[in-house]
Amino acid sequence: MSCGFIHLILGPMFSGKSTELIRLVNRYQIATYNCRVIKYSKDNRYGNDAVYTHDKCYISAVSTDSLFDIKDTLDDVDIVGIDEGQFFNDIVEFCEYIANKGKIVIVAALDGTYERKPFGNILNLIPLSEKVTKLNAICMICHRDASFSKRLSDEKEIELIGGKEKYLSVCRSCYLT
């Protein structure tokens, strides 16, 4: 049995996680691998049939809120890309299952909430990943490297999907002010 591997791409809002996911999947597509990208069904800001970056670059995708619900559609797939991995409750078990089937899994996800706490169980994927990439954004206040996402509203729910109208990428100093 050939084993696949897991590549986890982490970072705050606006750090280029989805852009990197799209870039990596496109490389595999050029090399004629059969690829499938999965997106979180509740993130429909730009549409339901593709993963979009904030600057409207996109790649075709299937939407779901449970990864295992679509596992049977992946038999002929070599590469599985997952965007917004932090929102999937079954992300850890699914990625391990798919990688153990010999497939390459690339996951883009926020590592922390707007409160700088672990987002869902995404950090539990780190010990199972062969490669972990941590991206930084640019602080939208002082323009230094930004490692955190700061919410602009007083809404308290963890799952609040949005872009620049709801979040800033910030450095430590600007997060605390």
Curated annotation (Swiss-Prot):
Residues reported in the UniProt entry to bind ATP: 11-18
Name the UniProt record assigns to this protein: Thymidine kinase
GO biological-process terms attached to the record: DNA biosynthetic process; thymidine metabolic process
Keyword set includes Cell inner membrane: no
Pfam families attached to this UniProt entry: TK (PF00265)
Keyword set, alphabetical order: ATP-binding, DNA synthesis, Kinase, Metal-binding, Nucleotide-binding, Transferase, Zinc
Chain positions recorded as substrate binding sites: 114, 158-162
Gene3D superfamilies the record matches: 3.30.60.20, P-loop containing nucleotide triphosphate hydrolases
Class of this enzyme: transferase
Enzyme Commission number, as recorded: 2.7.1.21
Ligand binding (Zn(2+)): 139, 142, 171, 174
An example molecular function term from Gene Ontology annotations: thymidine kinase activity
Entry annotation: catalytic residues: 84
Family: Belongs to the thymidine kinase family.
Domain of life: Viruses
Matching PROSITE patterns: TK_CELLULAR_TYPE
Transmembrane segments: none
Catalytic activity: thymidine + ATP = dTMP + ADP + H(+)
Organism annotation: Swinepox virus (strain Kasza)
